[in-house]
UniProtKB/Swiss-Prot annotation:
Name of the molecule in the record: Trigger factor
Cell compartment(s), UniProt: Cytoplasm
Pfam family, one: Trigger_C
Function: Involved in protein export. Acts as a chaperone by maintaining the newly synthesized protein in an open conformation. Functions as a peptidyl-prolyl cis-trans isomerase.
PPIase FKBP-type domain boundaries: 162-247
Catalytic activity of the protein: [protein]-peptidylproline (omega=180) = [protein]-peptidylproline (omega=0)
Family in the record: Belongs to the FKBP-type PPIase family. Tig subfamily.
Alphabetical list of PROSITE patterns matching this protein: FKBP_PPIASE
NCBIfam families hit by this protein: tig
Lineage: Bacteria, Pseudomonadati, Pseudomonadota, Alphaproteobacteria, Rickettsiales
Keyword check for Cell inner membrane: no
Keywords, ordered alphabetically: Cell cycle, Cell division, Chaperone, Cytoplasm, Isomerase, Rotamase
Length: 445
């Protein structure tokens, strides 16, 4: 076998490989002889089929199989001999395999970069810490009480905030009834903001049996595009008004929610608030870590990974209105530059974390995958069981989560064992403002 290196620079390795025809022919002959002992052909006893007959029937497929095996063997030999750290499948080009010539082909191999892991101990980050107070917990209890109110008492008085109102309504745009603009026996709590902004407020002061006009403007980001931003008039009939019986928040109330006492329910809400904030805090900290890593990493990345990441970004932006709006006023040149920079950041950090996980021998456990699946499910409120079933029945989809799961595990290891974390305490209100500002800053990263 002859090997001529054509290119060995950066992350590209190209070589021309040739194998003498005699080697190919010898292997073909051995394969055909072996087949004479196995194949069954009408008119011949088992194991007594002449080589010429076997060659006539199977010669082409045997030759193709031998050539494919020879190519794979040769490529693997080159990879071992040159100690190549490859990514993806080698590309075979300019193949010459005519029967009267040697087997020759060019192999193009893409390489993984050599990655130097930075000294994480030189990196420091703020770690927001939520201090849950009694006011935060009481707000959650009040919300729960509001959700479980019993609207049993019918009222003849004027509608006020907090009342449950049953209505029929027909919507008109430019005096023409529009599709899906009709409500029948619809129950709404005044002040819940369940309807279009301004709708509920205009019901206040009316009574059961009255008919009123409600004038509203659909929000610009309304889910029905044909209604977004348009003025509408609803003819509303007030069919019934009910007031809620006062809800007493005590131990008996807590028992309705699998708690033995009100104090136990308060403890539950304290932990829930902490857990909900923890996920958001981790996401922000992860992005802040990546910001610092982006400035430290400068190695080349495989072109195939870069293109793959750019395609993922573009396809994700097409489906995300918020992301799309950030780029709508940009020129094609600016958009391309943006995708190039963002894709490079993601690929570099992904490769670094994979190398770091390998260096620390971090292995995925079932719990790691469960956490990632839970995160995916939380993106689809009300459809969690469907998401769980999807991953349960699709092993390939699970495979696709292993990369992100290992990345998360590496990041958590870095937080716990490497970088310096400076704890900074926030109230719930302060933390919400901080997280909102940070989320706007890292949009699309």
């Amino acid at each position: 076998m002859g090997i001529t290196v054509l290119k060995n620079e950066g992350l590209d390795f190209h070589a021309r490989i040739s194998t003498p025809l005699s080697e190919i022919d010898d292997d073909i002959q051995k394969e055909l002889l072996d087949l004479t002992k196995k194949v069954k052909i009408a008119g011949f006893r088992a194991g007594k089929v002449p080589v010429s007959i076997v060659k006539k029937k199977y010669g082409t497929s045997v030759r193709n199989d031998i050539i494919e095996r020879k190519i794979n063997h040769s490529v693997n030999h080159v990879i071992k001999e040159h100690n190549l750290n490859i990514i993806g499948r080698p590309k075979i080009e300019e193949l010459q395999n005519e029967s009267d010539k040697a087997l020759e082909f060019t192999v193009k191999i893409e390489l993984l970069p050599k990655i130097t892991i930075p000294d994480f101990k030189k990196i420091s980050l703020d770690r927001p810490k939520l201090e849950v107070n009694s006011k935060d917990v009481e707000e959650q209890l009040e919300k729960l009480a509001a959700l479980t109110k019993n609207y049993t008492k019918e009222s003849k008085a004027k509608i006020k905030a907090g009342d449950q109102v049953t209505i029929d309504a027909i919507g008109y745009i430019k005096e023409k009834a529009f599709k899906d603009g009709k409500l029948n026996d619809f129950k709404v709590i005044i002040g819940s903001n369940a309807l279009i902004p301004g709708f509920e407020k205009q019901l206040i002061g009316s009574k059961t049996g009255s008919e009123i006009d409600v004038n509203v403007t659909f929000p610009e980001n309304y889910h029905a595009k044909d209604l977004a931003g348009k003025d509408a008039r609803f003819v509303v009939q007030i069919k019934a008004v009910h007031t809620a019986e006062p809800t007493v928040i005590d131990d008996e109330f807590a028992k309705k929610f699998q708690s033995n006492s009100l104090e136990e329910l308060r403890t539950h809400f304290t932990k829930q608030i902490e857990n909900e904030s923890e996920e958001a805090i981790n996401t922000i900290m992860k992005m802040n870590l990546f910001d610092k890593l982006e400035k430290l990493l400068d190695f080349d990345v495989p072109e195939s990974l870069l293109e793959q990441e750019k395609n993922i970004l573009k396809s994700g932006t097409d489906k995300n209105e918020q992301d799309e709006s950030l780029l709508k006023d940009k020129s094609s040149k600016e958009i391309t530059a943006y995708y190039n920079k963002l894709a490079l950041r993601r690929v570099r950090i992904g490769l670094l974390l994979a190398e770091y996980a390998k260096s620390k021998n971090l292995q995925l456990e079932p719990d790691d995958l469960r956490k990632v699946i839970m995160q995916q499910a939380r993106n689809f409120p009300g459809q969690e069981n469907m998401i769980f079933d999807f991953y349960k029945n699709n092993p390939r989809a699970i495979e696709g989560l292993k990369g992100p799961a290992l990345e998360d595990k590496a990041v958590q290891y870095i937080f716990n064992h490497e970088i310096k974390l400076k704890e900074k305490k926030y109230t719930k209100e302060e933390l919400e403002k901080y997280l909102e500002a940070e989320e706007q800053r890292i949009t699309l990263i």
